[in-house]
């Protein structure tokens, strides 16, 4: 937290905020202010009815409140006062992108004066709580997704549900969702909005997740609520608020629908012993492409998501599967602004042609599909994989999704189910994608997963680096490395092997000197690290 913070109540209610003294950029951060390229999030809404446009406007209003909630979870200060304390426009925008004074793509290092280190537990836990104290304590909803940990009047650890801690904001969001439902032409979508509103009020999201899985034909969609646990870097238990407002691309979605049918067969063929692949993925899963028109909260903080795989609820996944949403317009923006120039800088000339948008789209898509494969519950009664691996669960799951995604592409290419591109395209584009993603920093779940995979592949000769710092992919060795790393990760997950994962991350989750040098060359070439958005009702022409 900022040393100069105003007074706040324990549950994030910022009614007693005092003005903040002005802060300024640390000198060493001057060169990082331009690492985000601004992209306009627009879409053709001409085919939407008047009611659908009214509904979109309301969904964006609900998302704005979600955005404020995530500021409270991530930073804990009053957003308006904090941003007003920054006089420089570019620095203020950088702080807005990062949802606070810490650089999300540089290990959460502070970039403003008078700023202390970011707590690994963000605002989900008391600032004075140690990890050991938490683990020894006994209290209700200790590992809960949807509650804050705080101290009671006796100084003991206890929890308060999100619906109570943020009651005003939650109720406002719920009312807006219910109003939006009255404008929905699609009955299933109207039902989902109403059930989601109820879920926000009572912190029980399973029924709304099931309702969301039943939606197949609605052209408008929204992902909203406390969903991912990446912001909780202390334990990975508690979920951050986020929202995406989406327009379905019907023609692209039709192309993708066939892949979900292969999930059971691909699960059976995983390169690991039978006991680690006994779970049967839900057969009601679907795969669709969308243009995203609004990001809010966690999804908008720092690096931007370009694909979604939800719900996270293991029971819903086993019963219904998951929905994989490919955010096509955001994906294209990243490919053009970042992937192409990275390939021209770090890939050998003869393989640059293998870096294609088709492969980038597929790698991203099958990463999300692969979240539905593998194992959700340990084989030795340690509970779910997520519970047993604690703060390492997210990083290992991201690594699993990457390597199993490549495994799936290889299998579907061999069956001619995928007819575009070659294995060399997908592998070379994947390697280029590691360079893109690792610039997000090695401290995040995705960053650790990137480094574990990069260093593992390097050890197994999947790619080589020449004296000029240019990389080339060895297709045969990459294939072998993908299968062996897949087996290793699935076994660590199935065994709930926290210590084994800890050792793997400690050994391979680091950036080596050569890679650091290569990443510096991308900075020297002024290639953006990620994108940020010009978005909202005005951009879309909505009232």
Pin down the residues of each PLM region.
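Bacterial signal peptide processing site
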Residues: 12-14
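Fold-level signature of zinc-dependent metallopeptidase catalytic domains
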Residues: 29-41, 46-55, 140-387, 391-395, ...
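C-terminal motif of bacterial Sec signal peptides marking the signal peptidase cleavage site
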Residues: 7-10
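Extended, compositionally biased alpha-helical segments that mediate assembly or anchoring
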Residues: 489-543
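Sec-dependent N-terminal signal peptides
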Residues: 1-5
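Long, well-structured alpha-helical subdomains associated
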Residues: 406-503, 507
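Structured alpha-helical bundle/scaffold domains in large eukaryotic membrane-trafficking regulators
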Residues: 78, 212, 443-446
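N-terminal helix-rich structural modules
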Residues: 19-192
């Amino acid at each position: 937290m900022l040393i100069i913070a105003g007074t706040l109540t324990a549950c994030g209610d910022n009614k007693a905020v005092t003005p903040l003294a002005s802060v300024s950029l640390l000198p060493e951060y001057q060169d990082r202010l331009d690492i985000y390229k601004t992209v306009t999030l627009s879409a053709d809404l001409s085919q939407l009815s008047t009611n659908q446009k009214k509904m979109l406007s309301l969904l964006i209003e609900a998302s704005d409140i979600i955005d404020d909630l995530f500021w409270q979870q991530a930073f804990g200060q009053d957003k308006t006062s904090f941003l007003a304390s920054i006089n420089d426009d570019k620095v203020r925008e950088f702080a807005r992108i990062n949802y606070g004074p810490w650089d999300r793509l540089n290990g959460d290092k502070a970039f403003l004066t008078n700023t202390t280190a970011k707590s690994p537990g963000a605002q989900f836990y008391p600032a004075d709580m140690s990890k050991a104290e938490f683990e020894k304590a006994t209290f209700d909803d200790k590992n809960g997704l949807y509650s804050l940990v705080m101290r009671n009047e006796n100084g003991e650890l206890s929890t308060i549900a999100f619906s109570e801690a943020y009651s005003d904001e939650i109720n406002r969001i719920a009312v807006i969702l219910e109003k939006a439902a009255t404008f929905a032409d699609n009955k299933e979508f109207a039902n989902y909005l109403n059930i989601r509103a109820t879920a926000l009020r009572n912190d029980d999201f399973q029924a709304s997740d099931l309702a969301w899985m039943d939606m197949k034909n609605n052209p408008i969609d929204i992902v909203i609520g406390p969903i991912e646990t990446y912001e909780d870097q202390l334990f990975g238990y508690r979920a951050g608020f986020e929202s995406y407002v989406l327009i379905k691309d019907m023609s692209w979605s039709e192309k993708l629908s066939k892949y979900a049918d292969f999930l059971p067969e691909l699960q059976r063929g995983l390169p690991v012993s039978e006991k680690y692949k006994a779970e049967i993925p839900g057969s009601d899963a679907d795969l669709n492409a969308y243009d995203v028109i609004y990001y809010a909260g966690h999804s908008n903080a720092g690096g931007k998501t370009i694909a979604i795989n939800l719900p996270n609820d293991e029971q819903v996944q086993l019963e219904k599967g998951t929905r994989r949403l490919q955010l096509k317009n955001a994906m294209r923006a990243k490919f053009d602004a970042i992937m192409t120039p990275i390939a021209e800088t770090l890939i050998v000339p003869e393989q640059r042609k293998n870096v294609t948008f088709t492969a980038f789209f597929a790698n991203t898509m099958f990463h999300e599909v692969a979240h539905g494969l593998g194992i959700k519950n340990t084989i030795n009664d340690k509970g779910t994989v997520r519970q047993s691996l604690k703060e390492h669960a997210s990083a290992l799951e991201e690594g699993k999704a990457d390597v199993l995604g490549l495994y799936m592409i290889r299998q579907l290419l061999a069956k001619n189910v995928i007819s575009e591109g070659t294995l060399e395209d997908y592998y070379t584009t994947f390697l280029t994608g590691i360079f893109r993603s690792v610039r997000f920093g090695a401290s995040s779940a995705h960053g650790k997963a990137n480094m574990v995979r990069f260093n593992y592949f390097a050890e197994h000769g999947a790619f080589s680096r020449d004296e000029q710092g240019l990389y080339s992919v060895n297709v045969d060795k990459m294939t072998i490395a993908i299968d062996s790393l897949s087996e290793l990760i699935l076994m660590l997950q199935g065994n709930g092997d926290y210590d084994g994962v800890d050792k793997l991350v400690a050994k391979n989750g680091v950036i080596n000197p050569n890679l650091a040098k290569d990443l510096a060359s991308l900075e020297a070439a002024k290639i953006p690290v990620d994108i940020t958005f010009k978005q909202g009702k005005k951009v879309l022409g909505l009232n």
